[in-house]
């Protein structure tokens, strides 16, 4: 299974008993999209939905995800690429489960996700959608690279390669691999920009010159 590699915020949503909670990869609760993405996920029914928050650009999504005021969620949506029933989600806390893997295959999980989405298409879902995928049988590297290049030309980061029959793994593993071209560049720093919100008074980002245009770099900065 080949899918585009998204450039957003990893988000795991749990829908249970009429409530929906969205979590970042770190486990931090994301509540700013409850009235948009959260309400639409409730229409899909109980389960665990895995995807990425997408929008105009990564920086703006990050700001809106944790902003406490002046919240603007317009244009932000959840691109889903996996699904787990609640009983399989509980396997993550089962100490007897070897490797903490689930029973449903990658393809079966995605088919269940598509079935839920198709049943609710008449509900006009605007903030939740499934990613596009391509299934290749015994692909060569050239086959995968062709799809990778297509995704990159459409603005994606690269390609995700998934084992058709693999169970869901809680954590990193070889069931899912990524293909991404590495690019580096030496750029002149033209300025320093202050952080916003709780990072006010600290370095927020570097301003650098790229092909004569000033851009900001600093997503990897820490306190």
Where on the chain are the PLM-derived regions?
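Covalent nucleotidyltransferase
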Residues: 1-125
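Classical nucleotidyltransferase
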Residues: 3, 9-51, 168-223
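Short aromatic/hydrophobic-glycine micro-motifs
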Residues: 46, 123-128, 156, 213-215
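Short, structured patches in soluble enzyme cores that scaffold and shape functional sites
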Residues: 53-55, 80-85, 132-134, 163-165, ...
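Extracellular/periplasmic catalytic domains that process cell-envelope and extracellular macromolecules
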Residues: 72-73, 152-153, 200
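Hydrophobic/aromatic-lined pockets within catalytic cores
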Residues: 85-88, 152, 194
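Amphipathic alpha-helical
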Residues: 130-183
């Amino acid at each position: 299974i080949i899918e585009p590699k998204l450039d957003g915020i990893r988000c795991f949503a749990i829908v249970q008993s009429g409530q929906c909670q969205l979590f970042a990869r770190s486990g931090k609760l994301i509540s700013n999209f409850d009235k948009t993405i959260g309400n639409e996920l409730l229409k899909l029914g109980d389960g665990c939905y895995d995807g990425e928050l997408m929008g105009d650009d990564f920086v703006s999504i990050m700001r809106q995800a944790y902003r406490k005021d002046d919240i603007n969620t317009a244009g932000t949506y959840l691109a889903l690429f996996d699904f787990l029933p609640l009983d399989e989600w509980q396997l993550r806390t089962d100490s007897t489960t070897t490797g903490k893997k689930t029973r449903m295959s990658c393809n079966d999980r995605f088919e269940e996700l598509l079935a839920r989405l198709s049943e609710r298409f008449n509900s006009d879902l605007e903030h939740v959608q499934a990613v596009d995928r391509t299934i290749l049988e015994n692909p060569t590297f050239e086959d995968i690279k062709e799809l990778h290049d297509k995704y990159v030309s459409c603005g994606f980061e690269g390609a995700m390669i998934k084992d058709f029959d693999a169970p869901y793994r809680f954590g990193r593993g070889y069931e899912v691999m990524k293909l991404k071209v590495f690019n580096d560049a030496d750029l002149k720093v033209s300025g320093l920009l202050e952080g916003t919100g709780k990072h006010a008074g600290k370095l927020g980002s570097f301003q650098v010159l790229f092909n004569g245009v000033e851009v900001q770099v600093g997503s990897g900065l820490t306190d």
